[in-house]
Structure formats: C-alpha cells, structure tokens
Amino acid sequence: MSKLFWAMLSFITRLPVPRRWSQGLDFEHYSRGIITFPLIGLLLGAISGLVFMVLQAWCGVPLAALFSVLVLALMTGGFHLDGLADTCDGVFSARSRDCMLEIMRDSRLGTHGGLALIFVVLAKILVLSELALRGEPSLASLAAACAVSRGTAALLMYRHRYAREEGLGNVFIGKIDGRQTCVTLGLAAIFAAVLLPGMHGVAAMVVTMVAIFILGQLLKRTLGGQTGDTLGAAIELGELVFLLALL
C-alpha cells in the first residue's frame, strides 16, 4: 500500500519522491492507486493552505489566495490545468468527435483553453478570499477541496471508456471497479466531514459529486469517453465547485 501511495504521488504531482520507494510496482497495477487520490489531495491542499495562512498575516488575503493557488499549480506541474485547457479547446471547437480529440492533443493553447484557465484560476482566488473574509478555515477548506476533487474524479473512471487508443488516462479509465470507487469516495467524504464539521463538508461534497457526474456524462456524449485531459479538467472544476459550495 505504501508503494502504491508513493507511486501515485510521483505520478500525479511534481513532489520529489525517491524512486526506491515505489520500485517494483508494475505500471499496469497503477489503477489500484485510485484509492490514494483523496489522501494525495489532502496533502496538496494542506500545503497550499499553510502557504495561505503564513502569507495572510504578511500580505493580506488576496495575495495569500493568489500564492496558494500558484503553489497548488506548481505542485502538480500544471498537469490538471493543462487538461482543463485542452478539454475546453477541444469540446468548444464545435468540430467532429475525432477533430475534438485531435485538438486536445495539440500542445498549443487555444482561445477557449486560455479563457478557461483565466476563469478557473481567478475564480479560485476570489472564492478563497471570500471564504477567508467570512471567517472560514482556509487550510481545512483547501485540504478538503483537493481531497474531494481527486476522489470524485473516480466518477469519470468507473464504467467509462477511454476515448483514445492510448494515453496516460488509460491507466485508470474503465479500469476501476465499484468497490474501489466506493472506497475512494468514502475516504473523500471522511476527510470532508472531519475537516469541515457540521455537515458543511459533506454537503459540499454531494454538490461536487453531482457536478462531476453531470460533467462526465456530457463529456461521454461529446467525446465518446474520457481522457487524461478530461480527468484533469474534472479535478480542477471539482476544486472550484467544492469551494463555491462552502460559500
């Protein structure tokens, strides 16, 4: 289990992980690592939340929110933001399904992708600032948001098909079963409930689950399945929806 956690931490983040900690784990077994996604999200959110808390007293709420969002993006290497941009470039191109998938492969940033990045990053900064001004616990909110967003991404993997013939997303999409999905969602719910008591966290998670489920169905109808890019988009949008639900 520990090897699986370190392998997933190295796979979906840019945090330094010694290779020997995950050595011996076959790539084809990575799908079992979905249950570690909420824990990894918890770690990322906690680090981002600590940055917010430290900077808030020094430079104020807006700049603290800006740098916490920046740190979160740096820790993931912009991996999920890139997926969001590619997904929006493809889906909003109004082309055929094959053309959409080809556009999503293009490394160049399009208008729709650029707008999506600006909107999501700016929205996160504004929502975090508003939560802090309302007296909500910033560290707990960020940690829960990151845990829940990565946990609910399982909804785009379970009983979905991979829209392409190859790619990194193929490790998870269509490869996880109902038990793994329930465990992943259960862990995310526990983290949300513990970090944000009084049912606020659980209620926000329910809203996020509904939003991500609907997103998954829309993407399935549009693209014929999911890709690594759509998983990244789901994680980014999941974070934002969860934080919005806390307002």
From Swiss-Prot:
Q: Does the keyword Transmembrane helix apply?
A: yes
Which terms in the GO cellular component ontology are assigned?
Answer: plasma membrane
Q: Catalytic activity, per the record?
A: alpha-ribazole + adenosylcob(III)inamide-GDP = adenosylcob(III)alamin + GMP + H(+); alpha-ribazole 5'-phosphate + adenosylcob(III)inamide-GDP = adenosylcob(III)alamin 5'-phosphate + GMP + H(+)
Cofactor(s) the record lists = Mg(2+)
Keyword Nucleus attached: no
From the Swiss-Prot or TrEMBL record, state where the protein is found: Cell inner membrane
- UniProt GO MF annotations: adenosylcobinamide-GDP ribazoletransferase activity; cobalamin 5'-phosphate synthase activity
Its chief place of residence is: membrane
**EC number(s) recorded for this UniProt protein:** 2.7.8.26
What membrane topology is given? Multi-pass membrane protein
The pathway it acts in is: Cofactor biosynthesis; adenosylcobalamin biosynthesis; adenosylcobalamin from cob(II)yrinate a,c-diamide: step 7/7
Q: Which GO terms describe its biological process?
A: cobalamin biosynthetic process
Keywords, comma-separated and alphabetical: Cell inner membrane, Cell membrane, Cobalamin biosynthesis, Magnesium, Membrane, Transferase, Transmembrane, Transmembrane helix
InterPro entries from the UniProt entry = CobS
Segments passing through the bilayer: 34-54, 59-79, 113-133, 194-214
Which top EC class is given?
A: transferase
What the record says about family reads:
Belongs to the CobS family.
Known NCBIfam families for this protein?
cobS
The entry's function note states: Joins adenosylcobinamide-GDP and alpha-ribazole to generate adenosylcobalamin (Ado-cobalamin). Also synthesizes adenosylcobalamin 5'-phosphate from adenosylcobinamide-GDP and alpha-ribazole 5'-phosphate.
Descriptive protein name: Adenosylcobinamide-GDP ribazoletransferase
Which species is this UniProt entry from?
Escherichia coli (strain ATCC 8739 / DSM 1576 / NBRC 3972 / NCIMB 8545 / WDCM 00012 / Crooks)
